């Protein structure tokens, strides 16, 4: 076997084990919560030694951040692709709303991990650094920036009122979807589901934000 081939296989195996560790971390967090999240618990999940984990992640903080980063990266790819397939501001805004609802609606545990656990993490399992913020910021540009570009293009063409704050509107629409899903997850966790079906609520959000793009909106 050639050296490049051996190196490629080594890198492939490294990536595979890294993914297995991230999946095991998710399992531990879902079962035990932030307070029960330790490297020892993850190691036991995989039948590895704690020392073996350090080969892939240098700390518990790094492991947790990379798990959240992976989820945001996947969400951004899905939603960003949906937005990029559109031509108008209204279509881009709708694509972002529907793709976000579709992505996290099928991954409610990932939604809770990404947006709720850091706030509830009294154990201090993860702190943010400038380097970590720099890695996360491109996700905002990929989604909010792409929606804003299409809204602004429509504004220049006179199709959308010029006073509409394009990027802020995209951000608020995104957080509205997340809020809807988090509320859905909250009531379902206590066996008291919402009266309104998710598709109907998503439709309402689309109509509300489309209205913001109309004259007088």
Regions found by a protein language model. Name each.
Residues 73-81, 113-116, 123-157, 168-172, ...:
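Amphipathic alpha-helical packing segments from all-alpha helical-bundle domains
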Residues 24-28, 103, 176:
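Short amphipathic alpha-helical elements of helix-turn-helix/winged-helix folds
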Residues 1-5, 102, 141, 145, ...:
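C-terminal peripheral helix-coil segments that are non-catalytic and often amphipathic
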Residues 66, 80-112, 134, 166-173:
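Hydrophobic alpha-helical connector segments
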Residues 38, 112-116, 163, 186:
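Short, hydrophobic secondary-structure boundary micro-motifs
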Residues 14-25, 42, 67-71, 75, ...:
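Generic hydrophobic, amphipathic alpha-helix propensity
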Residues 20, 24, 28-62, 66:
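Helix-turn-helix
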Residues 98-105, 116-125, 212:
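Helix-loop "lid/cap" segments that line or gate small-molecule binding pockets
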């Amino acid at each position: 076997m050639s050296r490049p081939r051996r190196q490629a296989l080594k890198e492939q195996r490294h990536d595979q084990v890294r993914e297995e560790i991230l999946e095991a971390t998710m399992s531990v967090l879902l079962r035990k919560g932030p307070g029960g999240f330790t490297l020892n618990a993850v190691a036991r999940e995989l039948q590895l030694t704690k020392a073996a984990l350090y080969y892939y992640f240098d700390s518990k903080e790094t492991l947790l951040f990379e798990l959240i980063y992976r989820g945001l990266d996947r969400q951004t790819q899905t939603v960003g692709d949906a937005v990029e397939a559109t031509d108008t501001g209204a279509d881009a805004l709708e694509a972002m709303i529907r793709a976000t609802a579709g992505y996290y609606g099928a991954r409610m545990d990932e939604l809770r991990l990404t947006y709720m656990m850091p706030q509830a993490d009294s154990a201090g399992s993860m702190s943010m650094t400038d380097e970590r913020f720099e890695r996360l910021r491109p996700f905002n540009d990929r989604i909010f920036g792409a929606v804003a570009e299409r809204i602004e293009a429509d504004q220049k063409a006179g199709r959308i009122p010029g006073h509409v704050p394009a990027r802020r509107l995209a951000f608020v629409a995104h957080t509205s979807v997340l809020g809807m899903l988090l509320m859905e997850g909250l009531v379902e966790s206590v066996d008291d589901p919402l009266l309104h079906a998710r598709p109907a609520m998503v439709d309402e959000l689309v109509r509300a934000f489309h209205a913001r793009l109309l004259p007088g909106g």
